[in-house]
Design a protein with these regions (language model features):
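Extended, composition-driven regions rather than compact fold-specific motifs
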Residues: 42-44, 84, 116, 120, ...
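A solvent-exposed, acidic/Ser-Thr-rich amphipathic alpha-helical stretch
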Residues: 28-102
Length: 158
């Protein structure tokens, strides 16, 4: 792997960490900064949003559901494992990983927790844009395990 490829790979690994940190620590307030204007956000077989406005709507809907929970708070932590990065061009890449989400209503520490809220296979198509930043063109999450508290199902209307 040449130096440019190593650099791009590290930048994409940092993108993964920064993205999930935005969700876990900032309530997804700036999440659309991680997406291209022409993005797609796909969750499962029947949920597909287009553009930054669609992504923003999803996270705004999520915030409305959180506001109805205990203390109006939901603690989340997203963990990415088994990361694979395939550079498909100088400015394009496919990123695959397993995302393990822990989530619970109320202030930390969440008590009586039994396990992950969701485990998903995640696929990102990424593009480095003119400003040099990598962004998501496509976010596709395929849930493999869903915990007993189906919060995300409520957000998705399921």
């Amino acid at each position: 792997m040449d130096l440019e490829s190593v650099s791009a790979t590290l930048e994409l690994q940092q993108l993964i960490s920064d993205y999930w940190h935005e969700l876990d620590s900032n309530g997804a307030r700036n999440v659309t900064d991680y997406y291209t204007e022409d993005c797609s956000f796909v969750a499962g077989a029947s949920f597909n949003l287009k553009g930054r406005a669609g992504v923003r709507k999803f996270y705004d809907d999520r915030a409305r559901h959180v506001a109805t929970e205990k203390d109006g708070i939901r603690i989340t932590r997203h963990l990415a494992a088994n990361v694979r990065i395939n550079l498909t061009g100088k400015n394009s890449a496919i990123v695959e990983f397993v995302m393990v989400n822990y989530s619970g209503a109320g202030a930390a520490p969440v008590k009586d927790f039994t396990g992950p809220s969701m485990v998903s296979d995640v696929y990102w198509d990424c593009r480095r844009e003119a400003d040099g930043k990598w962004r998501l063109v496509t976010f596709r999450g395929e849930p493999q395990f869903i915990g007993g508290e189906n919060f995300i199902g409520k957000v998705l209307g399921k």
